[in-house]
A protein has these predicted regions:
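Extended, helix-rich architectural segments
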Residues: 1-209
Length: 210
């Protein structure tokens, strides 16, 4: 398992390599998705973000394209995938067909009961604007969610990616902030550092980098 120093150095190197992209992303988001325009220019919550806009043409166009892609590719109201086995002979078995249909139905139900549709829409907005998106899925958060799984479209400023020799993304590092309270909820009290433990009792809203 890679240690902290190795991971830190690799993230720093990836951050240097993507520096020129960050300027482009910031400019695009300023005009197309200002609510996410926190790549190079960091703003506080509630601060005005539309000072460079002439009108909402770019924002509207991005929303329409993202909605069209979602409705076509991952519609919340229409089936958009089915399941089959590699063995075609088994696929002809009626019992196997019924099992696969039931499994697909359970998956659809799970998607529609969670925040999948909200977060996948954010993913399409990112793809249509800056051309890169990361949809993260994990187990529901330790007693705080009842959905079983939880989705999160990561902000472009949070993560660093690298491709394999075949051009496929095989590495993703993420840097993000959590309050002390959120960190304890996410990792458990015994799994966070002493500073976070202390802050969770005295200053639960104080933020830490992870």
């Amino acid at each position: 398992m890679a240690n902290y120093d190795y991971i830190k150095k690799r993230i720093d190197r990836l951050g240097q390599e993507r520096g020129t992209w960050e300027v482009n992303w910031q400019e695009i988001l300023d005009y197309v998705m200002p609510r996410k325009a926190d790549v190079v220019t960091l703003r506080t919550r509630g601060e005005k973000r539309t000072e460079v806009l002439f009108d909402s043409t770019a924002i509207t166009a991005n929303n329409l394209l993202a909605a069209s892609l979602q409705g076509t590719l991952t519609s919340p109201s229409l089936p958009w995938f089915s399941i089959k086995l590699r063995d075609e002979e088994l696929n002809e078995n009626r019992d196997v067909q019924l099992w696969l249909e039931d499994t697909a139905r359970r998956m659809y139900d799970t998607f529609n009961e969670t925040n999948f549709n909200t977060e996948v829409h954010e993913m399409y907005l990112d793809l249509c604007s800056i051309g890169t998106a990361a949809l993260f899925v994990e187990e529901g958060n330790k007693g705080f969610d009842t959905d079983g799984i939880h989705f999160n479209c990561l902000h472009i400023a949070e993560y660093y990616i690298q491709e394999s020799i075949n051009g496929k993304v095989d590495t993703l590092y993420r840097k993000y902030k959590l309050t002390a309270r959120q960190a304890v909820q996410e990792f458990g009290f015994d799994n966070v550092g002493e500073k976070v433990q202390t802050a969770s009792k005295e200053k639960p809203d104080h933020k830490f980098n992870f």
